[in-house]
A protein has these predicted regions:
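Hydrophobic core segments of beta-strands in well-ordered, beta-rich domains
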Residues: 70, 95-116, 136-160, 182-187, ...
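Loop/turn position at the start of each blade in beta-propeller repeats
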Residues: 92-94, 189-191, 240-242, 337-339, ...
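Loop/turn-rich, solvent-exposed surfaces of beta-rich toroidal or solenoidal domains
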Residues: 322-371, 404-418
């Protein structure tokens, strides 16, 4: 789990010099650390064992004077600092929520429209709404006529008054608290909506047809009109079964899909999830997807035996193309863990996949996530959180990250960075192997921001201490103070530090 060096170069604003001091590998840490208190150095990371910890490097010497420019600290990308919150978004949003950030103060949620006072779970009957008389309303950030609704912090725009089509609807927010309903965005046959992306001013809304099969797509250039966009038909021909796909656009404009692959598992016995996730890429996100190596592959040993399972929807929903509900899979042993209902996001070049986590042994389902420094590399397991079948999605909004599920509890996080890290750098100015001047102790941390034109690519500013006031010297030393200030299991785990020098 390494941060891409290429991205670090970008955030420095210049090329890493050969003379820069980088502590990255397990060997680097062992060779350069002078003392560690309240932490352990394991597998190339410094992990606190107490609430507070300190790390001091040895003095890095040189034969000529050098001026330090900056210190950058990278943490483990495991991203465990999530905080539970009550249901995110409209209270009457049904089924799996789909999130889409168009830009600052422009956040969207898609789901089924329920005429009930609480979000219903898939398969549950909605409670009938009481009698209500709508009244005109005003809301900051909206210049269209609005009406009140029986749901708290929710309003109807003109598009929201148009009749439903049986598919997903759109709600918009400027603050992730108040939501304006703009009406349908997919037809009834597209009720199994799984993901959305933003491409050149248009929303790509992906859905399975039939359920758990080939991803199709609506392209919508007007989310406000209460009318579904243009149905472009099948986007990805699923070579297996499973879909429940998540889509993400890279910075070159290519669209990637992460898709469930049920070929190694009896999915009906494992919450319709799988240990295997396929990955395909397309230039436009509408067609031409080419499959790559799997994004997730936690299969156990294949037995060579073939089993079958039954799906309830294929023949019913698409009898033209599906003559049977029976599918085959290769039996694997021992029992496998299963993942699915994928959602993707990229933070400063580090990719994350969030999805269902159904552990082996019949334990409680939860949200699980994986990470990789490249969308083209296999993802590594991070952790899990919550309870129940989540069907999650993730978005960046209002300066933080929101993880929405179809359960009663959602989650929010300031980002992968875990507070608190304080740093100072010292310099030996007279070549006596002693530090003559230190900087003040300064708290450093990463920050995150939108990238114009991209919904799921998030910019990262590194945790950096600028050292322009430090004089030239023959030796430099780094000291770090770590304090676990969170109320969850996360802690500031150091993975890499870089002391850059002026040329």
């Amino acid at each position: 789990m390494r941060i891409l060096i290429g991205f670090v170069v970008v955030t420095f604003g210049g090329r890493l010099a050969a003379s820069d001091w980088v502590i990255d590998t397990a060997e680097d840490w062992a060779r350069n650390i002078e003392s560690v208190e309240g932490a352990t150095v394991v597998e190339g990371t410094v992990s606190p064992t107490d609430r507070t910890a300190t790390v001091s490097t040895k003095i890095k010497t040189s034969t000529s004077k050098r001026r330090a420019k900056s210190l950058v600290v990278d943490q483990s990308p495991v991203w465990q600092n999530w905080k539970p919150i009550e249901n995110l978004g409209p209270t009457n949003l049904g089924d799996a929520p789909v999130l889409l950030t168009v830009g600052p103060d422009d956040y969207w949620m898609f789901g089924r429209y329920r005429k009930s006072t609480s979000r219903g779970k898939r398969g549950q009957k909605a409670k009938p709404a009481p009698s209500f008389q709508a009244e005109p309303a005003l809301l900051d950030g909206f210049d269209v006529p609005l009406l009140t609704t029986p749901f708290p912090n929710q309003f109807d725009a003109p598009g929201g008054l148009k009749p439903g089509t049986g598919g997903y609807h759109a709600w918009q927010s400027r603050d992730m608290k108040n939501w304006v309903h703009h009406g349908p965005v997919t037809e009834g046959f597209a009720k199994w909506t799984t993901s959305a992306e933003w491409v050149d001013g248009k929303a790509h809304i992906y859905y399975d047809f039939p359920n758990d099969q080939d991803p199709h797509v609506f392209v919508d250039d007007d989310l406000f009109d209460g009318v579904p966009g243009k149905n472009m038909g099948m986007a990805v021909k699923d070579p297996s079964h499973g879909s429940d796909a998540g889509f993400i656009r890279d910075l070159d404009g290519n669209m990637h899909v992460i898709i469930e692959d049920w070929s190694p598992i009896s999915a009906n016995k494992r919450s319709w999830d799988s240990p295997l996730a396929g990955h395909a890429v397309s230039k436009d996100g509408v067609s031409g997807f080419v499959f790559q190596k799997p994004a997730v592959d936690n299969r156990t040993k294949p037995t060579g035996k073939i089993g079958t399972y039954k799906h309830p929807h294929w023949v019913k929903e698409d009898p033209k193309n599906y003559k049977t509900n029976i599918a085959e899979y290769e039996i694997h042993e021992p029992e496998q863990e299963a993942y699915g209902d994928w959602a993707a996001i990229c933070v400063g070049g580090q990719y994350y996949l969030f999805g269902d986590y159904d552990p082996a042994g019949g334990h409680q389902m939860s949200v699980g996530w994986f990470t990789s420094p490249s969308i083209d590399e296999q993802f590594t397991w991070c952790d899990s959180i919550g309870k129940g079948h989540p069907d999650p999605d993730i978005a960046f909004a209002e300066g933080k990250f929101y993880l929405a599920t179809q359960q009663k509890t959602d989650f929010t996080s300031p980002g992968p960075w875990v507070e608190t890290v304080e740093a100072r750098v010292g310099v030996d100015t007279d070549q006596d192997q002693k530090i003559d001047q230190w900087t003040d102790w300064i708290e450093i941390k990463e920050s995150y921001d939108y990238i114009p034109g991209f919904s799921k690519q998030i910019a990262k500013t590194p945790a950096e201490l600028m050292l322009s006031d430090l004089p030239e010297g023959y030796g430099h030393q780094i000291e770090l103070r770590l304090t676990d200030t969170t109320e969850n299991k996360s802690k500031p785990i150091l993975e890499r530090i870089t002391l850059a020098f002026e040329n």
